[in-house]
Amino acid sequence: WNEHYKMYDYIRNELPDLVMHHFPATAKKSISGHSMGGLGALVLALRNPDEYVSVSAFSPIVSPSQVPWGQQAFAAYLGENKDAWLDYDPVSLISQGQRVAEIMVDQGLSDDFYAEQLRTPNLEKICQEMNIKT
């Protein structure tokens, strides 16, 4: 299945073309997502900053290469090469110099996964260090 699992390419390339073809949309794109989709939104915006005018994430996992659930998912989707995982880790991408002007994250503090899996403070910290508005 993973040979054909190309969600990044679908969201970045195919979906915008589909939307532009079927809806009265402008060329300006924003991206948002919840949970794993929030991770995807952050990664897409950070890796393609000229393509998106804004990024919003709701309860995203922000440092997946550093937490048990993310490590398990990355091993399944990307294999055991941990260097490849960093290309899909928002905190790592920002620390490597990837930029967006502003990131909006909404995260409930009572979320059962907040401390162990989501690690939102890690994103806040790296954004402050790199002068990215949150």
Q: Which residue ranges define each predicted feature?
A:
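Non-catalytic cap/lid and distal C-terminal segments of serine-dependent acyl enzymes
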Residues: W1-T134
